[in-house]
Amino acid sequence: MNSANDGSVKKYVSQRRTVDMSSPYDRLYFYKKHAIPLRTIQPESTYTADIMPPDAYRDHRRVLNIPTKFTHLSSNKVKHVIPAITWTPEGRRLVVATYSGEFSLWNGSSFNFESIMQAHDSAVTVMQYSHAGDWLISGDADGTIKIWQPNFNMVKVLDRAHTECMRDISFSYSDQKFVTCSDDNVLKIWNFSNGQQERVLSGHHWDVKSCDWHPKMGLIVSGSKDNLIKLWDPRTGRNVSTILGLKHTVIKTKFQPTQGNLLAVVSKDKSIKIYDMRQHMRELQTIRDDMDYMSLSWHPINETIFSVGCYNGAIKHFDLLHDNSNSTPACHTIPYAHEKSVTSLAYSPVGHILASAAKDRTIRFWARSRPVDPNAFDDPTYNNKKVNAWYFGINNNINAVRPKTEHGIALPPANETNLGTPQPSILGSESIAANNGNVPASGLPGLSF
């Protein structure tokens, strides 16, 4: 709106970034219907239009599915610590739970705020959707469980289901039962249809921090502050196996969600352990760092990729098929993803966006990088700069996008080429930095093939 004699003020329209997967899915369907082979993505910006949905890259091209690009920052007007986030089953919205007991909904494409409601009287610590997407279960710091419909109509309250703070919830593969764990040292199995407690799993000697139900079998895993991992038979309530070897609190235990062949365990002894269930829980790999890992999420499409959040606010992505013989096993690291400890990570059901929450009271969205994206490493998540770029990144201003020149998209200055944490090439090839000295050699989508 232009200035006029009536004193009106000129307003500038800013561009809001939107991440929409409709067009790539339509193109992928067309390619498959007519048996057209997918184009190989080359390190050139013109190949951006050829990027397909994550489901198309299950082979060696899975590197394209790693979310390396900061997309948006969201936060409530009244900010609280965010202990849990989860995507709605169709992936259109992100549900955010806070220490104030509120649920807030954020759009999963344009990342704008949609609604907020008071869900619990105390801090909401855990929540999970059923596999069918028909129900949402949440738990709070008082040990109360609430069951919600997808429209957030509350249908049942299990008051004081636990005597201490709830730590984790997991549905069975059939959605007929669910398991909960708490700081009261026990796990409980509940009948979902009537809300009745069926079994109490006792065996841990301290707070139970995590639990998960196998996606295809009648098997429950739990991790506790007593440094033990236990496997349970939900039919009998008996402990069938105990895994030793951890030196500190077990923070997270998570089965691989698609096949369930792998188990990831995060511990406060600064390690991540991967166990292979097909080989009698043999320890497949151990990843150690000098910083505590706090949260973990498996990629919903690629079975070997998972992401972890660190105590110092960093986010690291791992690929079990990647050569981890070097001193930095992560295939990609975002060193300044958050300003404080990362409390929760959640992949979109499609796998193209990763949402992260932290004790800095913000939610941040991460998408896949475009080929040779000059902003992929030139933003505050890598260089820790709080001026200009940080402001534009938060507001999604059009100035945050690097302008085009007569030679194409402007590249970072030569003194900014080493921003971030350089990693080796995931596909084992040489970085394209050998051909263009202005591109960071970081072994990432569009930067190293």
Curated annotation (Swiss-Prot):
Keywords: Chromosome partition, mRNA processing, Nucleus, Repeat, WD repeat
Positions of region (Disordered): 411-432
Gene3D superfamilies in alphabetical order: YVTN repeat-like/Quinoprotein amine dehydrogenase
Keyword Cytoplasm: no
BP GO annotations: chromosome segregation; co-transcriptional mRNA 3'-end processing, cleavage and polyadenylation pathway
InterPro entries on file: G-protein_beta_WD-40_rep, Pfs2-like, WD40/YVTN_repeat-like_dom_sf, WD40_repeat_dom_sf, WD40_rpt
Residues in WD repeats: 77-116, 119-158, 161-200, 203-242, 245-285, 288-328, 337-376
UniProt xrefs under Pfam families: WD40
Cellular-component GO terms for this entry: chromatin; mRNA cleavage and polyadenylation specificity factor complex
Compartments where located: Nucleus
SMART domains assigned to the protein according to its UniProt record, in alphabetical order: WD40
SUPFAM superfamilies referenced in this protein's UniProt entry, alphabetically: WD40 repeat-like (SSF50978)
Biased composition (Polar residues): 415-432
PROSITE patterns listed in its UniProt record: WD_REPEATS_2 (PS50082), WD_REPEATS_REGION (PS50294)
Protein function: Required for 3'-end cleavage and polyadenylation of pre-mRNAs. Also involved in chromosome segregation where it has a role in chromosome attachment to the mitotic spindle.
Protein name from the UniProt record: Polyadenylation factor subunit 2
Source organism (scientific name): Eremothecium gossypii (strain ATCC 10895 / CBS 109.51 / FGSC 9923 / NRRL Y-1056) (Yeast)
UniProt lineage: Eukaryota, Fungi, Dikarya, Ascomycota, Saccharomycotina
Protein encoded by which gene: PSF2
